[in-house]
A protein has these predicted regions:
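Domain-level signal for soluble alpha/beta catalytic cores
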Residues: 1-307
Length: 307
């Protein structure tokens, strides 16, 4: 929501300040998305983990921003869409890439997840993570709060198919799919055409349902106004491509306004079933940055030599 609010002239940062200062601004935008036919509506709590808010100077508003974010979204959804609690990165890297520990990361996200859960979200959307270790901490945090609600996770990648911390799309899928998550995907950074190439690499090795949420092209700022260079018609054009690669959940990230989503929904309504993409049959071992194929189990018999 932050980019959409910025494009509409609301320049306060973080965007979560509007949850308490001008809640109707957030509610109006969310109602527009609901009117376009979204199935899932995320809360305006992207930056609202306590560590990020403290860095931005809003540490004391942590609880208010999160509680208000859920209440506004639930009012906007009005049983027409399911409300998912939106959580994202702290802006720091977990040790050894950064200065805070894995346990600190888990506790940071647990505090946010607990409030979103108390306010009645119907699931969680973890998105725009570039450090897979921090994403794992967020997953653990959510599952400390609830073992039952659906959990969607998205990492963000550069055009070469790696995150800025060096994790490939394949390593991401192999590392995350055995955790207690329901949907694995990618979001942000890339336009649809670039996202497709990365998404296909993910889809080939991932055994979980898939999600894709690209940007509406490239941002353009003329000194007065922010816009993105991909029209809503061009954005919706990629619906078939996403489905062909097996996407079960399709949305948008930066620059995708209600009109982008309306046209995407119309395109999806004409073809609702994701394709069963051919999967890579190999098994893999993966670290944060290295993916290694392994051979299937091989049984070796040994002749018994009785004494």
């Amino acid at each position: 929501y932050g980019v959409q609010l910025l494009m509409r002239g609301y320049r306060d940062s973080p965007a979560e300040t509007y949850n308490v200062r001008q809640p109707e601004v957030v509610a109006t935008l969310q109602r527009e998305y609901v009117a376009c036919g979204v199935d899932l509506l995320s809360t305006n709590t992207f930056n609202s983990n306590p560590r990020k808010l403290k860095t931005l100077g809003f540490g004391e508003d942590f609880e208010r921003f999160n509680r208000a974010g859920v209440r506004i979204a639930k009012e906007a959804a009005r049983d027409k869409a399911r409300v998912f609690g939106n959580m994202s990165a702290t802006g720091e890297f977990v040790f050894p890439l950064g200065g805070y520990t894995f346990d600190e990361a888990v506790e940071t996200f647990r505090r946010q997840a607990a409030i979103l859960y108390e306010e009645g979200v119907e699931g969680f959307l973890l998105e725009t993570f570039s450090d897979i270790k921090e994403l794992k901490a967020a997953i653990m945090a959510v599952r400390k709060v609830t073992a039952d609600l659906p959990l969607i996770v998205n990492m963000t990648f550069e055009a070469d198919g790696r995150s800025i911390t060096g994790t490939s799309a394949e390593s991401y899928a192999v590392s995350i799919q055995d955790l207690d998550v329901d949907v694995i995907g990618i979001n942000c950074t890339l336009a649809p055409a670039q996202s497709l190439r990365v998404f296909e690499r993910l889809a080939r090795v991932c055994q979980k349902p898939l999600c894709i949420q690209p940007n509406a092209g490239t941002p353009i700022y003329d000194g007065h106004r922010l816009s993105y260079d991909l029209s809503s018609e061009s954005f919706a054009f990629y619906a078939d491509d996403f489905i062909e690669l097996g996407a079960s959940i399709i949305g948008g990230c930066c620059g995708t306004g209600p009109e982008h989503i309306r046209l995407m929904r119309r395109a999806l309504d004409q073809r609702r079933s994701p394709r069963a993409i051919d999967k890579d049959p190999k098994r893999y071992l993966s670290s944060r940055t290295v993916l290694t194929p392994i051979q299937p189990f091989l049984s070796i018999g040994e002749r018994i030599n009785p004494a």
